[in-house]
Amino acid sequence: MNTSEQGSSSMSRVAIVTGAARGIGAATALQFASEGAAVAVLDLDESDCAGIVGRIRAAGGTAIALGCDVADEAQVDAAVDKVAAELGGVDVLVNNAGVTRDNLLHKMSAGDWDLVMNVHLRGAFLCSRAVQRHMVPKRYGKIINTSSVSALGNRGQANYATAKAGIQGLTRTLAMELGPFNINVNAVAPGFIATEMTDATAARIGLSAADMQAKAAEITPLRRVGQPEDIARVVAFLAGDAASFVTGQTLYVDGGRRL
């Protein structure tokens, strides 16, 4: 598949989305499928992916589910090769798998630091390295990484903020290395998005999900929190050829929160 075969959307492409069983990843998988892409729905537990795969197939789309620990080199390589074999290649990768283990520095364990780093940074590295083997020979590909506004620093998130800042550095570096092969690498940095992850954060600090969302909306210029679909649509744009001259960028999708 070469650039002349591509449209302005992800139609007719094969997309891998990690962390796709729920939240932003699930919305992204559904968005790609709605545009005609064949989607590999990856998450730690394959059974968790069944719901999204079922929705895609019920709508007439093509999707497969794969269980994969993105921090495990052998699992990542095997998963990417399986996608390429079953779906006919790999055109798009969305590195979205993530986890939080929030705490203040003096309370944060080395294990919680390592877990967050491994899932976010090691995972994005391993998945990107695996897909480039399929993208470089055909001189075409799109890699979109999920960063966060927390990359700018956030109390109680030394591990997460550092990992998300690292994602931005990885994005720029891969854009330099892979650009000569017509592979675009970009990142999105979501603000507060209403997901199970942010609901869990609310519970951890003793707030209801609704109260936490209301507080976040108050300090957001657009006066609302984001939905997973807000991010999915931006990811789909970056994966399409309308963004073919965009690479190495981090797009903040935060309702103006960073202003």
Segments from the language model and where they lie:
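Short, flexible catalytic-loop segment of classical short-chain dehydrogenase/reductase
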Residues: P190-A200, R204
